[in-house]
Amino acid sequence: MIQQESRLKVADNTGAKSLSVIRVLGGSNRRFGSLGDVVVASVKDAVPGSSAVKKGDVVKAVIVRSTKEVRRTDGSYIRFDDNAAVILRPDNDPRGTRIFGPVARELRDRKFTRIISLAPEVV
């Protein structure tokens, strides 16, 4: 369950290291986000130098890993060791060219197929 002020690791090579959630998109009273949800976030840590994003930038990102377990349709549960997100362009494609770490299969249902194809492991 990702909410306002939650810290997320960045699972791509855009140069950002961590994000702070400003808002979970999808309704005026939406409080929590889960796997596959899009959030508006601020870059809190970034790699120094010429990276795609800088500290203080406001970006859109999709949640790809969450420590809160998510129930699947077959009755199993999936959870990860950290909360992570991938920074998006306005057309919902990833801004980076590489994805680090596993991502959830739920992203395929949410039409983030480009992230699925770049990920080294889909769980």
UniProtKB/Swiss-Prot annotation:
GO process annotations (BP): translation
Gene Ontology terms: cellular component: cytosolic large ribosomal subunit
GO MF assignments: large ribosomal subunit rRNA binding; structural constituent of ribosome
Keywords from the UniProt entry: Ribonucleoprotein, Ribosomal protein, RNA-binding, rRNA-binding
Highest taxon listed in the record's lineage: Bacteria
Keyword Ribonucleoprotein: yes
SMART domains for this protein: Ribosomal_L14
CDD domains: Ribosomal_uL14
PROSITE patterns named among the record's database cross-references: RIBOSOMAL_L14
Subunit structure: Part of the 50S ribosomal subunit. Forms a cluster with proteins L3 and L19. In the 70S ribosome, L14 and L19 interact and together make contacts with the 16S rRNA in bridges B5 and B8.
Function field: Binds to 23S rRNA. Forms part of two intersubunit bridges in the 70S ribosome.
Membership in a protein family: Belongs to the universal ribosomal protein uL14 family.
UniProt name for this protein: Large ribosomal subunit protein uL14
